[in-house]
Amino acid sequence: MKFKVNGHEVFASTGGRPFDKKKPLIIFVHGSGLTHMTWVLQTRYFAFHGYNSLAVDLPGHGLSSGESLKSIEEMADWVSDVIDAVGHKEASLVGHSQGCLVTVECTSRYPSKIKTLSLMGGAGAIPVSYTHLRAHETRI
């Protein structure tokens, strides 16, 4: 599924089911340098069990356009904008690794928009190596 957020195209895997605004929304947020592919099995499961399941590619990742966002706060605001862009008032969030930091921040900033929060493989903020950043920037 493709849609626009802040003028940039966003790609989100729907788990093999069409998006239906009547169904509750779950947004899956991947870790640093990863993509929607992190969530292949999870999105499919929830899509086939009554949910709108969106595994988004953050800007500058995977099939989404735009520059990579520079802070957890920017990413959290972007996730809130995704909820608006797909026409929902609230969503459940699932984060992995850096996606945990993003979803926690989003929940803190927009509590009325977040129904539930699930975290997998999260950690506190850690320094990122130059090699990791360079590989992401050049998409090696």
Indicate where each model-derived feature is located.
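Active-site micro-motifs of SAM-dependent methyltransferase domains
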Residues: L34, G60, C100, G124-A125, ...
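Conserved hydrolase catalytic core segment
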Residues: E90-P127
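Conserved catalytic-core motifs of eukaryotic protein kinase domains, centered on the activation segment
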Residues: T38-V40, S64-L69, V128-Y130
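Conserved small/polar residues in nucleotide/adenosyl-binding loops
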Residues: T131-I140
